[in-house]
Amino acid sequence: MQRITVLGATGTIGVNTLDVIARHPERFSVFALTGHRQVDRLAGQCRQFRPQVAVVADAAAAGELARQLSGMNVEILHGEAALVAVAASGSVDAVMSAIVGAAGLAPTMAAVRAGKQVYLANKESLVVAGRLMMEAVAASGSRLLPIDSEHNAIFQSLPADFSGDLDASGVERIVLTASGGPFRGWSAQQLAHVTPEQAVAHPNWVMGRKISVDSASLMNKGLEVIEARWLFNAPPGRIEVIVHPQSVIHSMVRYRDGSVVAQLGVPDMRTPIAHALAWPERMDAGVPALDFSLLGGLTFEKPDQEHFPCLGLAFDALREGGDQPAVLNAANEVAVAAFLEKRLAFMDIPRLVQKAMHQFAGRVSNSIEELLELDAEVRRHLLCSLAN
């Protein structure tokens, strides 16, 4: 039986993870659940899964959770140190890293350094600290299994014995598919008037607000390009993005002999979650079978980088190296939050990100602490700029 900590249990990935775990009580035992400030949802999850530990953001949330779980034998902790503790605990075999944003970086690194099997849904761990994260994986013997549908699809489409050498495996290119988001085909005039309500309405996937905006701007795909570089040791010139509006093909691998291997499925995050949790086996995810007779057609087109420049900015950050991906990520988080609060126009998101990349060019951090300091510095600078 696998003992697991779920970081970010109350978010979309966390909820889907627990849905899969609930289908296989004989395989999994939940050691810890974390839920930031969604106390009501976390309390319900604690009643169902009976973890030994629950972690929230602060003392106020911890007090409310304790009140709701009165009489239950669960240790309630709060703060980043508690997240790190449950991620690295000797009582767990594996960690689902599903906290959104840079807040997930420290506990994910702690899990890796402790040699855990890490189910990686937190993009920022590789976007912000890819080099450091992969060095830690190599040093500790940890294993990263990707949860993003695209990276999980690539993982499934590569040879089972893939060891990080594309040439040795006969791989030409990795192809990430993108839905194109809700604004695919829109004009510049239309994009100038996009509202947060429109941006969070993804055509194919059920996701959180931040990642929905990233999908709409194609920044999500840009972050995935950076992740793919580290997960599969793929230079930017061997990563390709294609728009596939139906979201049935989740990603592909082009091989030297002309073959293309793809992973298909109904757009449901429980599939990649179940694949990772059961790897190298397979188990039921509760997902309906893909009915080819109902598909109609599968279409593809090049991404529109003129109207959606965030994808190009991510490639730029990857090529420039150093801390540019971390700067891009921090700036994007600030910009998206401002957009959701209706303080920034949708098309100003890439402008703000590009401005930050110019202002913080040339930085190179050599520790998680330095990266987090840079992250905070970028955020402070941009928040001050927005306030003025």
Swiss-Prot record:
Report residues binding Mn(2+): 148, 150, 224
Instruction: Provide the protein name.
Output: 1-deoxy-D-xylulose 5-phosphate reductoisomerase
- The set of disulfide-linked cysteines is none
Return the Pfam families for the record.
DXP_redisom_C, DXP_reductoisom, DXPR_C
Q: Quote the NCBIfam families the UniProt record gives.
A: Dxr (TIGR00243), PRK05447.1-1 (NF003938), PRK12464.1 (NF009114)
Which annotated residues bind NADPH? Answer: 10-13, 37-38, 122, 124, 208
Keywords of the record, alphabetical order, are: Isoprene biosynthesis, Manganese, Metal-binding, NADP, Oxidoreductase
Q: Which reaction does it catalyse?
A: 2-C-methyl-D-erythritol 4-phosphate + NADP(+) = 1-deoxy-D-xylulose 5-phosphate + NADPH + H(+)
- Give the protein family: Belongs to the DXR family.
Residues that, per the record, bind 1-deoxy-D-xylulose 5-phosphate: 123, 149-150, 179, 202, 215, 220-221, 224
Species of provenance? Laribacter hongkongensis (strain HLHK9)
Q: Which GO terms describe its molecular function?
A: 1-deoxy-D-xylulose-5-phosphate reductoisomerase activity; manganese ion binding; NADPH binding
Gene Ontology process terms (BP)? isopentenyl diphosphate biosynthetic process, methylerythritol 4-phosphate pathway involved in terpenoid biosynthetic process
EC numbers for this chain: 1.1.1.267
Cite the annotated pathway.
Isoprenoid biosynthesis; isopentenyl diphosphate biosynthesis via DXP pathway; isopentenyl diphosphate from 1-deoxy-D-xylulose 5-phosphate: step 1/6
User: Which cofactor does the UniProt annotation name?
Assistant: Mg(2+); Mn(2+)
* General function of this protein: Catalyzes the NADPH-dependent rearrangement and reduction of 1-deoxy-D-xylulose-5-phosphate (DXP) to 2-C-methyl-D-erythritol 4-phosphate (MEP).
